[in-house]
Structure formats: C-alpha cells, structure tokens
Amino acid sequence: SIAELCKVLTTGPLNADTEVVVGCPAPYLTLARSQLPDSVGVAAQNCYKVAKGAFTGEISPAMLKDLNIGWVILGHSERRAIFGESDELIADKVAHALAEGLKVIACIGETLQEREAGQTEAVCFRQTKAIADKVKDWSNVVVAYEPVWAIGTGKTATPEQAQEVHVALRKWFTDNVSADVSASIRIQYGGSVTAANCRELAAKPD
C-alpha cells in the first residue's frame, strides 16, 4: 500500500547523495505528500499544457502546486501509445510545467519494432528534439529513457544497451543544446527495473 511504501521511505535510511522522487496516481498525491519527509519528492504522472480553461478531467501544474507537488512525469510511453500524445503536445506540456515551477521527468523511448529496425537513436533524438525546441533551461529536467518493450513486460534492457543510448543522448545534447547541459543533465533508465538488476544498471557511468 501507499502507506507501507511511505513508511519504508521515511524510515530509510536513504542515501543523502541520491534524490528520491515517488510518482503516484493523482488521487493519492496528497496522501503521499503528507506521509513522506520533505527530502523525498512526489511526482504527478501527468499534467496539461495550460494553466486553466475548459479541459474537463485534466490537471494543471497550478493545481499540482496547490497540493505542494514539485514534480511531474511527462511523455510516458503509455501516454504516447494509449492516449495518442504527440511529441509536440508533450513538449508543450514540459515547457508549461517548467514555466509554472515544476520539475519534470521527461520520458522518451522506442518500441520493439523501432529497435529491431535500427531506429532507437532516431526515435529518441526526435522525441528529445521536440522538447528542446520548446525548452531552453534544462536545470529542472530529468530525461528518462524507457524503452517501450521493457515496460511491464519482464524484459529489461541490458546495462550495456541502456548505457549505449544514454551515451548517444549525451552526445546529442552536446551537438544540439550545449556541452554544459550534456554534462549536467540527469538521464535515468526505466523499464522493468527490480531489486535484482538495479545495482548492475546503476553501476553504468551514464
């Protein structure tokens, strides 16, 4: 349960050098925030691209801030695939969330078909470029590489596969944004990460 997870994260101990952020469904954001220490961030799993208006069912960054939520996950593969969110819409959402003072976990990643077709880098670069076209300050952005074929399938990208993509992304940032952003931006891997494989994945330099 959320209460049990919050208790574990509260009693820890957590590594002081590691920023911990918990992403939970919207109905439980307030509960999670109230039960976690301030040192643990809470992220919404989505938000919309404008502050207010006739968008029934959508949650704005302003609403999240009212709940004392500091983070939001945007561009998750399920939002792209199931709800048809385009690269452009996700970029607009990222830009607006940042402008409103939220920190963003921006998700990118390829499908199995795209990987088998040798399109992994092309897809990741396209998705990242859409965001880069709208975002100039990357200090509050974490890029999450989440290969679609490794989400909820039990399949995990090998540490070597994840590292290859992360290296390619850093080079893309060097070539298309700046060397400073490339060196400082956090890139994380997501996709069937478990207690059994997290140490090996985390050992990779990128």
Swiss-Prot record:
The keyword Isomerase applies. PROSITE patterns: TIM_1 (PS00171), TIM_2 (PS51440). It catalyses: D-glyceraldehyde 3-phosphate = dihydroxyacetone phosphate. GO terms for molecular function: triose-phosphate isomerase activity. Keywords: Gluconeogenesis, Glycolysis, Isomerase. Pathway: Carbohydrate biosynthesis; gluconeogenesis; Carbohydrate degradation; glycolysis; D-glyceraldehyde 3-phosphate from glycerone phosphate: step 1/1. GO terms for cellular component: cytosol. InterPro entries: Aldolase_TIM, TIM_sf, TrioseP_Isoase_bac/euk, Triosephosphate_isomerase, Triosephosphate_isomerase_AS. Transmembrane segments: none annotated. Its EC number is 5.3.1.1. Gene3D superfamilies: Aldolase class I. The active site is at residues 76, 146. GO terms for biological process: gluconeogenesis; glyceraldehyde-3-phosphate biosynthetic process; glycerol catabolic process; glycolytic process. The keyword Cell membrane does not apply. SUPFAM superfamilies: Triosephosphate isomerase (TIM) (SSF51351). It is an enzyme of class 5 (isomerase). Homodimer. Belongs to the triosephosphate isomerase family. HAMAP family: TIM_B. This is Triosephosphate isomerase. It comes from Aedes togoi. The gene is Tpi.
